[in-house]
């Protein structure tokens, strides 16, 4: 979009093709009458401060690597919202902000035991990313897990397991990378005997 026409409301827009440097090609300009212009703008987490503190980042999310309390690889440093990973809804941003705040308050009180983290692993051919990347057994918390599928899948069963114990299982009629999905569990620390794995398979 190179121009927007209208005074009190949108009446039309001018659109152009772009060259390899993303510059408009004026000879391709055309006018499209319309009454609204809707912009869908991608986001990338900004983590310059986290990097300065030595926080480990996940190449898949561009955000911090965290456990279920949202604590990063640096003790006492927590990450949430779109700085952690891009959320679809502001509701999820608010919820993770509340969670990070509560976790930080507990940490400041000195109630947090020494970390006993186990990794969360997933099939990278099917999942774009999974957050959190670790579960801290010492925290004895439930877990809210966010994920995006790598592409579109239909009639899938997603399982979070530790060894042979299925901690969470949820069925999805449709999965697409444009929609973030959420999995939740109560306290599972006593059931974790090994690393946590997240898998996806055709629904039976």
What are the functions of these language-model segments?
Residues 30, 41, 57-59, 96, ...:
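Conserved mixed alpha/beta catalytic, RNA-binding, or beta-rich assembly cores of soluble enzyme
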Residues 1-2, 91, 99-171:
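Mid-to-C-terminal Rossmann-like scaffold of FAD/NAD(P)H-dependent oxidoreductases
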Residues 1-9, 76-79, 83-89, 95:
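Predominantly flavin-linked oxidoreductase catalytic cores and closely associated redox partners
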Residues 35-87:
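FAD-site-proximal beta/loop scaffold in flavoenzymes
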Residues 65-67, 77, 96-99, 106:
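Helical hairpin unit composed of two closely spaced alpha helices linked by a short loop
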Residues 175-184:
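Aromatic sugar-binding surface patches on proteins
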Residues 145, 158-160, 183-204:
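Short, aromatic- and glycine-rich surface loops/edge beta-strands on solvent-exposed regions
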Residues 1-48, 141-174:
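A Rossmann-like FAD-binding core segment of flavoenzymes
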